[in-house]
């Protein structure tokens, strides 16, 4: 049975009760429980807590719902308000990249749309992927295609290859919504989401966090599998912070190439005070 002074217990109000009176009722209820509990520690602590609780609730910030006090836009450590929105953003911008070899063997990877100019007017979208997603089909060994979520095939052409950072830019006839690039780099503990064609399953999603990072690599706890390579690594606002690139057998982390790594050949970047700024 919940204590009547439990500050996490929501009150029931008549449907026609004004919002201002609801807030005042919450203040009275929480004030009793909060002040009584903290006053055992210090009368001053109880009084200060009472003032903060009252002000927060009255002005529309219900402290008993602590999650609402943290905005993902300004805090990379918290989960997004609506993870489904982040999944939808990725879904509209991520593709499967297929390499079919002459012996009919098939390899799959992923790619994500970026706001860069395609190589010619024939193509509608620019896409980032991994170098190793494409290299089985180099030298006319096979045919590369871009596949949408319904596995419809689209033409593509390779624009830029960066073997050192295992990255590539391609253009395709598929029409995609470009993903936004994160305005800042990640830090250990940041929330992340991977999206791609894990083990051939289109639209696979996993959540995790940044374990650590270097200038060019991001180590993540989110699960990835063969086929995730080239897909986007997203933050809690749906912005790209990296490109999923490799996994560690028997370890608890996987890896992505950061946006900074794209500055070598793909992005036009400025370097200032030890940091890259991409355009």
Map each language-model feature to its residues.
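N-terminal targeting leaders characterized by basic, low-complexity, disordered sequences
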Residues: 1-27
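C-terminal cap/linker of serine protease catalytic domains
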Residues: 8-15, 59-60, 65-76, 81-87, ...
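N-terminal Sec-pathway targeting helices
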Residues: 23-49
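A short, Trp-centered hydrophobic/proline-enriched beta-strand micro-motif
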Residues: 88-104, 110, 192
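Catalytic nucleophile loop of clan PA
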Residues: 112, 224-244
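Flexible, gly/ser-rich surface segments that form the specificity/activation loops bordering the active-site cleft
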Residues: 177-228, 244-255
């Amino acid at each position: 049975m919940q204590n009547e002074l439990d500050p996490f217990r929501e009150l029931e109000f008549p449907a026609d009760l004004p919002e201002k009176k609801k807030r005042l009722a919450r203040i009275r209820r929480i004030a009793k429980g909060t002040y009584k509990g903290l006053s055992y520690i210090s009368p001053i602590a109880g009084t200060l807590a009472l003032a903060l609780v009252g002000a927060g609730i009255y002005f529309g910030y219900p402290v008993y719902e602590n999650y609402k006090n943290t905005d993902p836009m300004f805090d990379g450590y918290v989960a997004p308000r609506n993870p489904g929105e982040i999944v939808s953003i990725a879904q509209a911008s991520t593709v499967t990249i297929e390499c079919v070899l002459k012996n009919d063997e098939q390899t799959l990877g992923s790619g994500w749309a970026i706001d860069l100019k395609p190589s010619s007017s024939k193509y509608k979208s620019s896409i980032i992927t991994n170098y190793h997603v494409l290299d089985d089909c180099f030298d006319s060994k096979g045919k590369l295609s871009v596949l949408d979520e319904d596995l419809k095939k689209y033409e593509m052409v390779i624009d830029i290859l960066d073997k050192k950072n295992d990255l590539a830019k391609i253009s395709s006839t598929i029409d995609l919504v470009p993903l936004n690039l994160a305005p800042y780099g990640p830090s250990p503990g940041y929330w992340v989401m991977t999206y791609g064609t894990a083990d051939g399953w289109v639209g696979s999603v996993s959540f995790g966090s940044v374990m650590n990072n270097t200038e060019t690599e991001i180590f993540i706890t989110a699960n990835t599998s063969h086929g995730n390579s080239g897909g986007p690594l997203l933050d809690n606002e749906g912005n790209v912070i990296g490109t999923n690139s490799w996994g560690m057998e028997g370890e608890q982390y996987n890896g992505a190439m950061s946006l900074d790594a794209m500055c070598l050949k793909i992005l036009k970047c400025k370097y200032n005070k030890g940091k890259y700024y991409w355009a």
